[in-house]
UniProtKB/Swiss-Prot annotation:
<dbReference type="GO" id="GO:0004640">
    <property type="term" value="F:phosphoribosylanthranilate isomerase activity"/>
</dbReference>
<keyword id="KW-0822">Tryptophan biosynthesis</keyword>
<dbReference type="InterPro" id="IPR001468">
    <property type="entry name" value="Indole-3-GlycerolPSynthase_CS"/>
</dbReference>
<keyword id="KW-0057">Aromatic amino acid biosynthesis</keyword>
<dbReference type="InterPro" id="IPR045186">
    <property type="entry name" value="Indole-3-glycerol_P_synth"/>
</dbReference>
<dbReference type="InterPro" id="IPR013785">
    <property type="entry name" value="Aldolase_TIM"/>
</dbReference>
<keyword id="KW-0210">Decarboxylase</keyword>
<dbReference type="Pfam" id="PF00218">
    <property type="entry name" value="IGPS"/>
</dbReference>
<dbReference type="InterPro" id="IPR011060">
    <property type="entry name" value="RibuloseP-bd_barrel"/>
</dbReference>
<comment type="similarity">
    <text>Belongs to the TrpC family.</text>
</comment>
<keyword id="KW-0028">Amino-acid biosynthesis</keyword>
<dbReference type="GO" id="GO:0000162">
    <property type="term" value="P:L-tryptophan biosynthetic process"/>
</dbReference>
<protein>
    <recommendedName>
        <fullName>Indole-3-glycerol phosphate synthase</fullName>
        <ecNumber>4.1.1.48</ecNumber>
    </recommendedName>
</protein>
<dbReference type="InterPro" id="IPR013798">
    <property type="entry name" value="Indole-3-glycerol_P_synth_dom"/>
</dbReference>
<keyword id="KW-0456">Lyase</keyword>
<dbReference type="GO" id="GO:0004425">
    <property type="term" value="F:indole-3-glycerol-phosphate synthase activity"/>
</dbReference>
<comment type="pathway">
    <text>Amino-acid biosynthesis; L-tryptophan biosynthesis; L-tryptophan from chorismate: step 4/5.</text>
</comment>
Length: 263
């Protein structure tokens, strides 16, 4: 299964990174940070004034699609998102399968005020400390990649650093884990990370089981206003969109159109 493969590679990378800078030294570096992460919840919760919230993703490649954008300039893409109403920006930092880079995060942080998500396969506190050091305001934790104890521990460590957490789920078992970790932002990924198959009815199945005080993010396969409208009506607050924005002629036009879905 590709998820297991990515996790294995991530753990190998972590061994090398820890040899260069151990966890204690990394945590010491966190004390030099002057600003606190933004309160992401206020940016992602749907309101009457701004019902559609968008997390726009900086994404060069994926295991299912290969290279998505050849002429890839992460900063230019992030600036376009920031200037055209994205509520948050997701920055892929996984290097092997998604061609991401941690440096993208710090480069973008220096140029935009929009909240930033470190999108990666996080399995260790080390990666969470890195996320804060490089400028993330929130991180992704994938329920499928962690057992309940691990998810809870990583969630609590992130919150101790004032980082918010997007906990990604794909089924009822994941949802139970997410709720037991006290997640406040729950992402429903329509794509099965084991098979890459899409289930666009997943929000319809899972949202009714989620307490109303949670913020719900719909992920994968969101590519037109009809899908956004339908998922918003089911209960999604925000939409994480990456590949679609990477392929359109004008990010500005597409983002503006999506933001105005209900107008």
């Amino acid at each position: 299964m590709i998820l297991d493969e990515i996790i294995e590679k991530t753990k190998e990378d972590l061994i090398l990174r820890k040899e260069k800078l151990n966890f204690e030294e990394l945590e010491k570096k966190l004390k030099t940070i002057n600003s606190k992460p933004k309160d992401v919840k206020t940016f992602l919760k749907s309101t009457k004034e701004e019902p559609i919230r968008i997390i726009a993703e900086v994404k060069k490649a994926s295991p299912s699609k290969g290279i998505i954008k050849e002429d890839f300039n992460p900063l230019e893409i992030a600036l376009e998102y920031s200037q055209n109403g994205a509520n948050a920006i997701s920055v892929l930092t996984e290097p092997h399968y998604f061609k991401g880079n941690l440096e993208y995060l710090s480069t973008i942080k220096n140029s935009v005020s929009t909240p930033l998500l470190r999108k990666d396969f996080i399995v260790d506190k080390y990666q969470i400390a890195e996320a804060l050091l490089y400028g993330a305001d929130f991180i992704l934790l994938i329920a499928k990649a962690l057992n309940e104890k691990e998810l809870k521990e990583l969630y609590e460590y992130a919150r101790s650093l004032d980082l918010e957490v997007l906990v990604e789920i794909h089924d009822n078992e994941d949802l139970t884990k997410a709720l037991n970790s006290n997640a406040t932002i729950i992402g429903i990924n329509h794509r099965n990370l084991g098979t890459f198959e899409m289930d666009m009815a997943l929000c319809d199945k899972l949202i009714p089981l989620i307490p109303k005080d949670k913020i719900i993010v719909a992920e994968s396969g969101v590519s037109d206003t009809e899908v956004i409208k339908r998922l918003h009506n089911v209960g999604a607050d925000a939409f994480l969109i990456g590949e679609h924005f990477m392929r359109v002629p004008s990010i500005k036009d597409e983002l503006t159109k999506f933001k105005n879905t209900l107008n």
